[in-house]
C-alpha cells in the first residue's frame, strides 16, 4: 500500500475552512434564536428586573401622595434606590 502524502499547508487550509464554517453556523444559529425571540439567561434576568421596576413604579405612581400622614421613603430595590410613599409609622426619611 502506498501512503498518501498531503502537504501540510493543505491540511492547515482545510482546518481553517472547517473552523470558519463552524463559526458561521454558530453565528447563524444565534441570529435565528434571536429572531425567534429566545433570550439568554442574562437577557431574561435583565428583562425581568426592568419589568419588575416598571410595575413597582406604576404602583407608586398610581398611589397619590396627597394623603395626609405620608412622606417620601427611600428603600433599596434590586440594588438601586427608588422612592415610595409610606406612613410615618414606617421607617421613613423626611424630605
Swiss-Prot record:
Residues 23-37 have a biased composition (Basic residues). Gene3D superfamilies: 1.20.5.3800. Keywords: Coiled coil, Host nucleus, Host-virus interaction, Inhibition of host innate immune response by virus, RNA-binding, Suppressor of RNA silencing, Viral immunoevasion. Residues 38-49 have a biased composition (Basic and acidic residues). Residues 16-49 are annotated as: Disordered. One of its GO terms (cellular component) is host cell nucleus. It comes from the Viruses. Homodimer. Homotetramer (dimer of dimers). Acts as a suppressor of RNA-mediated gene silencing, also known as post-transcriptional gene silencing (PTGS), a mechanism of plant viral defense that limits the accumulation of viral RNAs. Forms a homodimer to measure siRNA duplex in a length-preference mode. Binds to both siRNA duplexes (19bp) and long siRNA duplexes (30bp). This is Suppressor of silencing 2b. It comes from Tomato aspermy virus (TAV).
Amino acid at each position: 500500500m502506498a501512503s498518501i502524502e498531503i502537504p501540510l499547508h493543505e491540511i492547515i487550509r482545510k482546518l481553517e475552512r472547517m473552523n470558519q464554517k463552524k463559526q458561521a453556523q454558530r453565528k447563524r444559529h444565534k441570529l435565528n434564536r434571536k429572531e425567534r425571540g429566545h433570550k439568554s439567561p442574562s437577557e431574561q434576568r435583565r428583562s425581568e428586573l426592568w419589568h419588575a421596576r416598571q410595575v413597582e413604579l406604576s404602583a407608586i405612581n398610581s398611589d397619590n401622595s396627597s394623603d395626609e400622614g405620608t412622606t417620601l421613603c427611600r428603600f433599596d430595590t434590586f440594588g438601586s434606590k427608588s422612592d415610595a410613599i409610606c406612613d410615618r409609622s414606617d421607617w421613613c426619611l423626611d424630605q
